[in-house]
Amino acid sequence: MKKIICFVILIITSFGCEKDSMNEPQIDQTTQYSIPDSLNFSILDNNLKITIKNEGKIAIHYNVENSNKHIKISSSAGEIAVGNQNDMIVSINRDDLSKGKFYSKLYFNFNNKKDSIVIGVDNFIEQKVILNSDVIDAEYSKVKDQLVFVSEHPMQVNILKSGSETIQTIPLLYTPTCISISQDGETAVVGHDGHITYVNLNTKSIIKTYNVSCFAIDIVLGNNKWAYVFPKENQSTYIRCINMNLSTENENHDNVNQIYAGTKGKMDLSGKFIYGAANGVSPADIDKFDIQNGTAVKIYDSPYHGDYPFNGDFWFSEDGNRIFTRGRTVLRISETKSQDLIYNGTINATVPEGHGNIEWLDHSSKKNNLYLILSSGYYWPPTRISGIFIYDSTNLNFKSKLELEKFFVPNNENGVFYDAEPYFVFSNAEATSLFVITKAKGAGLAKEWAIQKIAI
């Protein structure tokens, strides 16, 4: 609050103004008033009040100048008798107002004396797409430029094209646990507990549902119309290989080589092989399986046994020549065994709490970037760090961090912001946008999942 005292020195014919104090000598006090220094609009405020008090000995005549189209005032002029006050309502029109904090001024004239009030406005625009579902698993087809994810509530496949904000869906009969998209982006297979569902992403329909003798923690759709199901349970188990060309007696597995339950699998770019990252065992390793004859047959594992951390998951480079592991180790891969799964560097993903794991990774060769979701520490479940970390895909050096839009929850006062916890990140085919699937961390919202589209 500022108090303005304007007075006349009778010895000379000039005027003076001072805030919160009076000059000496004081002979004839004429105009004295008080107004706030500033008016600050929170995200939820649209109307605030300014009180103008006449604390002098004569009436005050005033007018207000406002040139900002986003600011409206209830009156632009008035008169205040001695000892009285006037209230003026200031309103904010947030249409076309950009996101963030902006400032403007209202200019006052009190009995020909100028003054001003700073107007501050905090504006929040919901730029992310709030989902009407949760997110269990997700993949992105750069061939079709579309994001595909499965949800439990409701049980469905969800499809979002890169240039659209409309999500198309395919209802499912069983609770989904994982999804794999075909390399051509035409079809996908969804894993369940005891079943898998083969879907057509073009017609948004179910092709067929098949029985499977396990709970699917991960699944891979081959180019041969086989589905490879990785079991969640039983420490030593087998990859269930489902020949979807057959309606019955279509489950096979390699009787010789077992895997550890919880293994995560992905098919390489050639479509001939699947790599699998073991979980629940130390040291964790990566196995290679040949699927050219349908059934997945283990042919060998990496030459390292505890030399480098793999930590149970991995992602391919776009050209299919490298693997980036959850433990930040980078490996070269090849169809030649002596050149396959060979150490090729480490991503120095240092976080404030120490060296964390990579929880998700996407590679854009056009940008020469790796987009990482990182966790802090080594505890389970992992604490995901809000933000997308960008690394150079050639030298593996850190470049920058992209901040994520928080979730805003209104309350009776100013509202609360919750961090956006990232789960999946994908770059589109042209490397112009990132799609980040986030969850409102600790908010407990009915709709706590969202997709953020970020220009890159």
Residue locations for each model-derived region?
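Short loop/turn segments that connect beta-strands within beta-propeller blades
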Residues: 161-165, 200-204, 243-247, 290-294, ...
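Structural motif
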Residues: 155-158, 197-198, 235-242, 281-288, ...
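A short beta-strand micro-motif common to beta-rich folds, especially ectodomain repeats
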Residues: 50, 100-112
